[in-house]
Amino acid sequence: SIGSELCRQISKQQPKQLIIVDIYENNAYDIQQELLRKNPSLNLLVLIASVRDSKKVNDIFAKYKPEIVFHAAAHKHVPLMETSPNEAVKNNVSGTLKVADAAGRNGAKRFILISTDKAVNPTNIMGATKRICEMIIQAMDKKYDTDYVAVRFGNVLGSNGSVIPLFRKQIEEGGPVTVTHKDIVRYFMTIPEAVSLVLQAGAYAKGGEIFVLDMGEPVRIYDLAFNMIKLSGLTPNKDIEIKITGLRPGEKLYEERLMEEEGLQKTANEMISIGKPISVDEKYLFEKLQELYVEAYNETEKMKELVHELVPTYKIDKRS
């Protein structure tokens, strides 16, 4: 969702060339057709590849030498990653390292990682892997001349697998609409708004920053369900039941934008702040990452312990 919108907004700026790399051919085909329909003169190249394939990734960077890289590829579904935690490490952590390294090795000017507020004091493996990705970006910024930054934000409205399409489907099917906890809250932003801010944050980059987007006031998910039922012309808990199902493994009642050690610096845009980066020991990080990959690929129980060593604020959910 974010990747597609990035392509839409970048294509309007008439880039010298826009290269889309995706592992899913159907998604890639859909956005390719949409972009060319709207802008037939766009110099667009669509490549099918996995971020886990370091040779393929390096070959792409060596051949096309992109100047600006937006890295949005990630497994993002919290409960699914709790049951497949090793896949979160292989795709999110290993994939980010391989793409970030290829960018630096091949002289990219700027690398922007799409991160999440779930990286802050994570209670789930998805958030913990995204925090490690932020650490990788900070370490890479010291290793190469490329300016590496991360942009951290919350949920986007209507994205694949998000709550609004789910509620809409549940209402269409006659209910119940399922909410995990009556008091659970989340930050929301529209996809175009989030991407517009990501592009602006990328323009502010000097290297090593974690940009934090102002998502406004948090929304209570129960209220969202209640209002969506009313907007459908139905009465909540009469025509359509709102069912409380209990927090899922790795799920928090609320998300945080910053860790305790981080402070906020303002930018020219009041919607974008810079989180004061926590220092990263690059040697320790890269050594631990090697151990982590071995455990993830061997699917051992030790993998989560290594994630906790890298991200001490990660609280392992014993239910998952």
For each feature predicted by the language model, list its residue ranges:
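Conserved residues in the N-terminal Rossmann fold of short-chain dehydrogenase/reductase
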Residues: 47-48, 90, 181, 244
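Aromatic pocket-lining residues of Rossmann-like dinucleotide-binding sites
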Residues: 6-13
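Helix N-cap at the beta1-alpha1 junction of Rossmann-like dinucleotide-binding domains, i.e.
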Residues: 24-27
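Proline-aspartate-enriched helix->loop->beta-strand connector
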Residues: 15-16, 61, 65-70, 78, ...
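Strand-loop microenvironment adjacent to phosphate/nucleotide-handling motifs in alpha/beta enzyme folds
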Residues: 135-156, 160-320
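Hydrophobic/small residue at the entry helix of a nucleotide-binding pocket
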Residues: 2
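Conserved Rossmann-fold NAD(P)-dependent oxidoreductase catalytic core, especially the SDR/UDP-sugar
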Residues: 71-134, 139-141
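Conserved Rossmann-fold cofactor-binding substructure of NAD(P)-dependent oxidoreductases
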Residues: 47-68, 250
